[in-house]
């Protein structure tokens, strides 16, 4: 434990809060270009083929981001909008791709939670 005199001379060091999405650089979203689109398997209790994309952002960061929803139209040079938000069962995936914006289409035939998947309101019969 420091003495009062030591605290007067040096002071306490403020703990820096580490960002959970450093590549965003305090932006809500970032634009990027897909460099690779592939599937990967989740951590232990779960089993699936999760769709992910490696994206080079406009600020130079290369990140792995998750493509939510059923089906997608992404290819290698697609331009996408990326937001923060990790996927708990995919290590290293700390970002999501925004559906229905830029080159990524919304989920087809989506009736519920449409705003999260960029789906337009269905036409009345």
From Swiss-Prot:
Quick one: where's region Disordered? 9-31, 106-125
Which processes are annotated in GO (biological process)? translation
Which residues lie in Basic residues bias regions?
113-125
Q: Which UniProt keywords apply?
A: Methylation, Ribonucleoprotein, Ribosomal protein, RNA-binding, rRNA-binding, tRNA-binding
For this protein, the record's InterPro entries field holds: NA-bd_OB-fold, Ribosomal_uS12, Ribosomal_uS12_bac
Q: Which residues carry this modification: 3-methylthioaspartic acid?
A: 89
Q: Which Pfam families match?
A: Ribosom_S12_S23
A cellular component term from Gene Ontology for this protein is: small ribosomal subunit
PROSITE patterns for the chain: RIBOSOMAL_S12
Database matches in Gene3D superfamilies: Nucleic acid-binding proteins (2.40.50.140)
Give a yes or no for keyword ATP-binding in this entry: no
Protein origin, superkingdom: Bacteria
Q: Which family does it belong to?
A: Belongs to the universal ribosomal protein uS12 family.
Briefly state the protein's biological role: With S4 and S5 plays an important role in translational accuracy. Interacts with and stabilizes bases of the 16S rRNA that are involved in tRNA selection in the A site and with the mRNA backbone. Located at the interface of the 30S and 50S subunits, it traverses the body of the 30S subunit contacting proteins on the other side and probably holding the rRNA structure together. The combined cluster of proteins S8, S12 and S17 appears to hold together the shoulder and platform of the 30S subunit.
Q: Can you name this protein?
A: Small ribosomal subunit protein uS12
